[in-house]
Curated annotation (Swiss-Prot):
Span list, region Disordered: 848-939
Gene3D superfamilies linked: Helical scaffold and wing domains of SecA, P-loop containing nucleotide triphosphate hydrolases, SecA, preprotein cross-linking domain
SUPFAM superfamilies: Helical scaffold and wing domains of SecA, P-loop containing nucleoside triphosphate hydrolases, Pre-protein crosslinking domain of SecA
Membership in a protein family: Belongs to the SecA family.
Compositional bias of kind Basic residues: 926-939
Subunit field text: Monomer and homodimer. Part of the essential Sec protein translocation apparatus which comprises SecA, SecYEG and auxiliary proteins SecDF. Other proteins may also be involved.
Annotated keywords: ATP-binding, Cell membrane, Cytoplasm, Membrane, Nucleotide-binding, Protein transport, Translocase, Translocation, Transport
Name of this protein: Protein translocase subunit SecA 1
Function, in words: Part of the Sec protein translocase complex. Interacts with the SecYEG preprotein conducting channel. Has a central role in coupling the hydrolysis of ATP to the transfer of proteins into and across the cell membrane, serving as an ATP-driven molecular motor driving the stepwise translocation of polypeptide chains across the membrane.
Gene: secA1
Keyword set includes Cell wall biogenesis/degradation: no
Known catalytic reactions: ATP + H2O + cellular proteinSide 1 = ADP + phosphate + cellular proteinSide 2
Length: 939
């Protein structure tokens, strides 16, 4: 055990003793709750809420609340929480990550802290890895909460904002991490308070916390809209790279010349073009220099085309269905429907596959999962495998990890790895092993790392006449049903990675599923007939349990579930998760991994060394070796990948920390505007700051006689209808030499405030307040969006600062701060300019109509007096709401630390124009191309 691990686990015993004491307290009062009627049990919820309101803490209420939930679960679900589940629930309430092995009933554990923390009325979020689990858990565990009088909601991908608002209003809300994160971002793009759906971030329990906070934390959540980008280049470069040859890097010191037109580093997932490749590309495109600034975008297209050709494999990284490229999640093997890679990568893959190329996207709002979860006042989580990542949980989220003991001792046999020289020999051995175990009836779960390999294995099994189920990205609709029955006698299930995670594999089959199916056949619904369902469930469960009990004994005799891994994963944790499907609740079980030198992990790390060992030992292809050195090499490779990934995540967080502080300021400002805070005073500050900035820029150097006051007054005239003249000020000061910056500033400020009052008199104060709100929101959104674009651009090139002996992070922080300050100044200046110069038409309305429903009128009309209680409708050029593309995409974590992935498409009109600046009619991207010759892209 490393020194760090020992430090991390120092207080473990103390915490476990505390959790044991809590479980004992709950047990000591359990009898008091057994005798209560359903109505009396339900009435306790209101009593607890009142006691909390009267000043008792949730910790004081914990034993009674937990005992209440235990009794309710017994009556509604026919399940009683074990003592270890009580300990797990207490750990979650105290804000720890509870490590609970597979089959220990994590879902049921979640009901305890959820009920207790919901008593405060501030809402509890239970976060799962996919929509299926969120819906299943909210229905099943929701019965317990509803029985006790709490409301339960569930956020699903296809819900409308009104439905989402209703779900967030519930005491307890289930949903996926991406949905919660995107709702937070969407709330911070809302145009009116009525569009907001979330009500704060009080307490979150994250199920499969390692998957969400570790595996998926490398890539930020991104909401993006179409950018202005030519798509013809993708197709041209896709054809062009087929004519380029892959080669190896050269080494001038060793006198090795580079070969081919480009090189590929699979480990780092990067490509580099060689001189010969550059020459060919220049020749084919008819340009003199590929690296001239005007051709910079072409380098990005070329790199993406090579990556699409070499690093992204069909049926492993993505599948093509109905002419659409769909990404496959490396961790779960599921298809990520509607998601897309960022940075032009998806378009390059579409061009490679010859399907329609869709638009590229520009970031509108973004946050990393790490920073999103740090918004919660209290965070906790549960998983079967957390101790390997304890240092990361502590360092990034300040979360301690507590290993909760199992209810029964673990008796699974973990066999040592078998290593073969070739992949074909390995799969032959796998099929032989499956056939042998299948013949005696032992259930088998086979884990593969890609759709391609699961289908290859499926073909081999079919050739041998072995009946089996395949569970991969192409069949995830049926996954829960398949996984639930994977423990039946003679069952063979081939699953891609951790598909079906969250569903227990019970030996002999799952009685819960059978009982539920029987009750639904009788026309009962757990949502509609809560009382009848609760009454009928115990008998149905009893019948189902009898049916599977005999089969359970048979399977137990055969050795339990046999888990067979066909490849080691990059992370030890994912290997442990696969193993953990077997040996649940003290059942017997067995696991083994089969490896070959062709496996991705072996190929990228240490493969040559292992190859030498096998050659020296003269091992035939079909004979496995069990060698300690090879096992150590694998452990070392996994450790390297884990360290590399941890560093990536830490790095992402360091850079996002800069944006995070800026985001807090902007989103805080937005929320104040949305909530109707009076902006009049703030607008006056905007005016003063803008005037000061103008005057300082013109008068910072030289004497008064040298100042170009005509240019300064020209700027004032663009900002507002200035009435004070230079001559008047000179006269008041005696002469030009008597003018001071302070005197000019005071005079202009008095003038601008006076003109603003006149503008308000002309429009009416209520309309002016609404105009202020709209203008500030509109300008703030556009400036923030442009700032995100600039920050993206800055981060892409910041690594090069290291060559100048500068710390890229420090430079990013410094320049990011300068850009943020410039953006804030821009918001002030543009807001003031809009407020004076917008031509406004006002219509009175009783109900609020979205502003974007009609094009703004450019005619100025007389102000209509506002009726009490109704918000005036303002139409003005440049104030269409919202000022962002309607076609939005949602980019969620991917699996290799590459660019984000885009999910969802809330489209209205496909021919939306990019947002254009009032000043020159160009988008920011077009202006950048004019001034800098296009945006650079990272390799």
């Amino acid at each position: 055990m490393s020194v760090l691990s020992k430090i991390m686990r120092a207080g473990e015993g103390k915490i476990l003793r505390k959790l044991h004491r809590i479980a004992d307290q709950v047990n000591s009062i359990e009898e008091d709750f057994v005798d209560l009627s359903d109505a009396e049990l339900r009435a306790l919820t209101d009593e607890y809420k009142q006691r909390y309101a009267d000043g008792e803490s949730l910790d004081d209420l914990l034993p009674e609340a937990f005992a209440t939930v235990r009794e309710a679960a017994k009556r509604v679900l026919g399940q009683r929480h074990y003592d270890v589940q009580m300990m797990g629930g207490a750990a979650l309430h105290l804000g720890y990550v509870a490590e609970m092995k597979t089959g220990e009933g994590k879902t049921l554990v979640g009901t305890l802290p959820a009920y207790l923390n919901a008593l405060s009325g501030d809402g509890v979020h239970l976060i799962t890895v996919n929509d299926y689990l969120a819906e299943r858990d909210s229905e099943m565990m929701g019965r317990v909460h509803k029985f006790l009088g709490l409301s339960v909601g569930c956020i699903l991908a296809n819900m409308t904002p009104a439905q989402r608002r209703e779900q967030y209003g519930c005491d307890i809300t289930y949903g996926t991490n991406n949905e919660f994160g995107f709702d937070y971002l969407r709330d911070n793009m809302a145009w009116s308070q009525d569009e907001l759906v979330q009500r704060g971030h009080n307490f979150a329990v994250v199920d499969e916390v390692d998957s969400i906070l570790v595996d998926e934390a490398r890539t930020p959540l991104i909401i993006s809209g179409p950018a202005d980008q030519a798509t013809k280049w993708y197709g041209d470069f896709a054809k062009l790279v087929t004519r380029l040859k892959k080669g190896e890097a050269g080494n001038t010191l060793k006198g090795i010349e580079e070969t081919g037109d480009y090189e590929v580093d699979e480990k780092k997932r990067t490509v580099a073009i060689h001189e010969s490749g550059v020459a060919k590309v220049e020749d084919w495109l008819g340009i003199d220099n590929l690296y001239e600034s005007v051709n910079t975008p072409l380098v990005g297209y070329l790199n993406n085309a090579i990556k699409a050709k070499e690093l992204f494999k069909k049926d492993k990284d993505y599948v093509v269905i109905d002419g659409e490229v769909m990404i496959v999640d490396e961790h779960t093997g599921r298809i990520l429907a509607g998601r897309r890679y960022n940075e032009g990568m998806h378009q390059a893959i579409e061009a490679k596959e010859g399907v329609d190329i869709k638009d590229e996207n520009q970031t509108l709002a973004t946050i990393t999962l790490q920073n999103f979860f740090r918004l919660y006042n209290k965070l906790s989580g549960m998983t079967g495998t957390a101790m390997t990542e304890a240092a990361e949980f502590h360092q990034i989220y300040k979360l301690g990890v507590v290993p909760i003991p199992t209810n029964k001792p673990m008796v699974r046999k973990d066999q040592s790895d078998l290593i073969y020289r070739t992949e074909v020999a390995k799969f032959d051995a796998v099929v032989d092993d499956i056939a042998e175990k299948h013949e005696k009836g032992q259930p088998i779960l086979v884990g593969t790392t890609s759709v391609e390999k699961s289908e290859y294995l499926s073909q081999q099994l079919s050739k041998r006449g072995i009946q089996h189920e395949v569970l991969n990205a192409k069949q995830h609709d049926r996954e829960a049903t398949i996984v639930a029955q994977a423990g039946r006698k003679g069952a063979v299930t081939v699953a891609t990675n951790m598909a079906g995670r969250g569903t227990d594999i019970k030996l002999g089959g799952n009685p819960d599923d059978l009982a539920e199916a029987e009750l639904r056949q009788r026309g009962l619904d757990p949502e509609e007939h809560i009382e009848e369902w609760a009454a009928a469930l115990p008998a149905a469960l009893e019948r189902a349990e009898k049916a599977v009990k005999a089969e359970f004994e048979e399977v137990k005799e055969l050795g339990g579930l046999y888990v067979l891994g066909t490849e080691r994963h990059e992370s030890r944790r994912i290997d442990n998760q696969l193993r953990g499907r077997s040996g649940r609740q003290g059942d017997p079980g067995e696991s083994r991994f089969y490896l070959s030198l062709g496996d991705d992990l072996m190929r990228l790390f240490k493969a040559q060394m292992v190859e030498r060992v096998m050659s020296m030992a003269n091992v035939p292809d079909d004979v496995p070796i069990e060698n300690k050195m090879v096992t150590r090499a694998i452990a070392s490779a996994q450790s390297q990948v884990e360290t590399q990934n941890f560093e990536t995540r830490k790095n992402v967080l360091k850079y996002d920390e800069v944006l995070n502080r800026q985001r807090e300021v902007i989103y805080g400002e937005r929320r104040r505007v949305l909530e109707g805070e009076d902006l009049q005073e703030q607008i006056h500050h905007f005016m003063d700051d803008t005037i000061d900035a103008y005057i300082e820029a013109e008068t910072a150097e030289g004497f008064a006689e040298e100042w170009d006051l005509d240019r300064l007054w020209g700027a004032f005239k663009q900002l507002y209808p200035v009435k004070v003249t230079v001559d008047e000020l000179e006269e008041a000061a005696g002469d030009r030499a008597g003018l001071t910056a302070e005197f000019i500033s005071e005079s202009i400020k008095d003038d601008i405030h006076e003109q603003y009052e006149q503008r308000e008199t002309q429009l009416g104060s209520e309309i002016m307040r609404e105009l202020e709100r709209r203008v500030v929101l509109s300008v703030l959104d556009r400036k923030w969006r442009e700032h995100l674009y600039e920050m993206d651009y800055l981060q892409e090139g910041i690594g090069l600062r290291a060559m100048a002996q500068k710390d890229p992070l420090v430079e990013y922080q410094r320049e990011g701060f300068d850009m943020f300050t410039a953006m804030m100044d821009g918001i002030k200046e543009e807001s003031v300019g809009y407020l004076f110069n917008l031509e406004v038409q006002v219509e009175q309305q009783v109900e609020e109509v979205p502003v974007e429903d009609e094009k703004p009128s450019l005619e100025k009309e007389d102000a209509v007096p506002a009726q009490a209680g109704a918000r005036p409708e303002i139409r003005a050029k440049g104030l269409e709401a919202p000022q962002r593309p309607d076609r939005l995409h949602f980019s969620a974590p991917t699996v290799d630390g590459e660019g984000g992935i885009i999910e969802g498409d809330f489209s209205s009109d496909d021919d939306e124009e990019p947002v254009r600046s009032e000043a020159d009619g160009l988008t920011r991207a077009e202006r950048r191309k004019q001034s800098k010759g296009g945006r650079r892209r990272k390799k």
